Amino acid sequence: MLPDHLIIRLILQDDARALLSLRLEALQDSPEAYGEDYDFVAGQPYSAWTDLVAHSLGDGDRAIFVAEIQGQLIGMVGVNRSPMKNTRHAGSVWGVYVQPSWRGKGLATELVQACIGWGQGKGLATLRLGVITANPAAIHCYEKCGFRTFGVDPNAFFVNNRYYDLMRMTLLFTP
C-alpha cells in the first residue's frame, strides 16, 4: 500500500544536494546493485552533480524522478533516451533506489511507472534496464511493470570480492 502524502515527481534543480545524498546512500546500502561506486560519486566535484540534475529535468533526453514524502526524498530513478540516431527509439532505466524503511510499499513500482510514462511520452519503442540476479524483489517489480528478461551478463559486477550476474530486461511499447 502506498504511503499517504507520497509524491512522485521530476527532479528540480533545487533538489541536487538531497538527490546526491540519496544516491550516496544507495551506493552504500546496496553497492552490488550499481555500476558506479560510492568513492567514484563522492569524489566528483559537486558541479558534476548539479550538471547532471540540470540535464535531467525531463524536458530533454533524460529525466530523474523522485519519491517524496513531506519534503524528504526517499526514492529515485533515472531514465534516458539513447543519443545515437540508430537507437533513439530506445531508453534506459537506471539507478532505482528506495530507502530501506520504505521498501515493500510499492514506491519502486511507482517510480518505474513514471519512467514508462516518460518514455511513452517521448515516443520510445522500448525501455531497457539491468538488475542483479541476486535481487528477486527488484526483478518482481520490473516484471510487474511489464519488463521481460532477454539475457544475463555473467559476472557483470565485482563488489566486495564477489561477482554478480546482471539480468537484462526490456519493455516493448505497442504502437
Spans of features found by a protein language model:
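Conserved hydrophobic beta-strand within the GNAT/NAT acetyltransferase core sheet
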Residues: 93-96, 127-131
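Acetyl-CoA-dependent GNAT
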Residues: 10-14, 20-21, 25-95, 99-101, ...
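Conserved GNAT acetyl-CoA-binding A-motif
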Residues: 112, 119-130
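Acyl-donor-binding surface of acyltransferase catalytic domains
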Residues: 1-11
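Active-site acidic-Proline motif in GNAT/NAT acetyltransferases
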Residues: 99-105, 133-134
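C-terminal "cap" of GNAT-fold acetyltransferases
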Residues: 5, 125, 132-139, 143-145, ...
